[in-house]
Amino acid sequence: MNKAVAKPDEVLSTLNGLIETCRDGQKGFADAHEKIQHAEIREFCLEQSRNRARFVGELQQEVQHLGGDPENTGSASAVLHRAWINLKSALGAGDRSIIAACENGEDSAVSEYRKALEQNLPANLRSVIEQQYLTIQQAHDRTKQMRDSLDPENRL
């Protein structure tokens, strides 16, 4: 049984929610880049911040194409807010704490993208969101690997 394509206002709400999610990630990774000492991880954080900025632009373009007003701020969602507040709190700590907070933020981003992909979106939007989701999922996995590599006992 095929579900009906999501209503335009639902699609716009989903896209704007993902814009907020990406803005949160962009800022979180930028903050981490400024504070992390480990060169490889610093570069990774910068790359992820840039990826999220690119995703914001892509999603905003889709919102405009649908006749909507793209979100211009970060998230008010409590889940994402807590994840990135944890990053802020960790900024006074070592690299492992900071990258662990990034991983928490990535957990939230992966979850938001999965929710979006559960909707019956138009094919062109689904393609954009799936590509971004795959990049975010890979970043999440890499973030976890980096966190584990910084753990002296390498606990999972």
Model-derived features: positions:
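Amphipathic alpha-helical hairpins
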Residues: 1-156
